[in-house]
Design a protein with these regions (language model features):
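Short loop/turn segments at strand-loop or loop-helix junctions that form parts
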Residues: 1, 43-46
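Surface-exposed cleft-lining segments at the edges of enzyme active sites
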Residues: 1-20, 54-56
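Metal-dependent phosphoester-hydrolase catalytic domains
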Residues: 29-40, 47-150
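Soluble or luminal CAZymes and related metallo-dependent hydrolases
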Residues: 11-24, 62-64, 137
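Internal, well-ordered alpha-helical scaffold/interface segments
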Residues: 21-25, 43, 69
Length: 150
C-alpha cells in the first residue's frame, strides 16, 4: 500500500531529486570557484533530462525531470553528450527510448573534450537472454568521452 501511494505521488522521482541535491551541495556546491575547476559527475541517474524532452514530451513541471533540472539550474555542469550532439537523441539503454546515463563536467574540462558518444555497436547492443531474462552485455550502453589533457 505504501509503495503504491509513493508511486502515485512520484516518490521515486522526488527521492532521487533530494539525493542529487545532497550530492551536488556536498561536492561541487561546497567549493568556491568550482565553475573554473575540473569537475566531473557521471553515472546512471535513473531519470530523464529536459534537454531530451523533445523525445519524451513531458510537461514542464513533470517530476521525471527534477534530477537534471537541479543539476542544470544549480551547478556549473554541462551535459557532455547533449552538448556535443545538440540535435540528436542518443539513448543509453537497450529499450532505445531513454537516456538515463549521463556525463557532466565543468566548462574548463568540457573545453578539453575531443569526442563524446554513446557506443552502439555489435558488441554493446543489449540483447535480452531468453532463459535468464537478463541483458547481455548490459542493459546500459557505454559512454565514451575523450579528453585532451595536454
Amino acid at each position: 500500500e505504501d509503495r503504491n501511494a509513493s508511486r502515485a505521488e512520484n516518490g521515486g522521482d522526488k527521492y532521487r531529486a533530494r539525493e542529487i541535491q545532497y550530492i551536488c551541495e556536498n561536492t561541487i556546491g561546497s567549493v568556491d570557484n568550482a565553475s573554473e575547476q575540473l569537475w566531473m559527475m557521471m553515472g546512471d541517474f535513473n531519470s530523464r533530462s529536459r534537454l531530451d524532452n523533445d523525445q519524451y514530451g513531458y510537461e514542464e513541471g513533470d517530476t521525471k525531470l527534477l534530477v537534471h533540472n537541479y543539476v542544470l539550474d544549480n551547478t556549473p555542469y554541462i551535459d557532455v553528450i547533449k552538448s556535443k550532439h545538440p540535435d540528436k537523441f542518443i539513448p543509453s539503454v537497450g529499450a532505445k527510448n531513454s537516456r538515463i546515463d549521463f556525463v557532466y563536467c565543468t566548462k574548463p574540462l568540457y573545453d578539453r573534450v575531443v569526442a563524446a558518444d554513446i557506443i552502439w555497436d555489435d558488441y554493446t547492443t543489449p540483447v535480452r537472454d531468453t532463459l535468464s531474462n537478463f541483458w547481455r552485455p548490459s542493459d546500459h550502453l557505454p559512454i565514451l568521452v575523450d579528453f585532451d589533457m595536454r
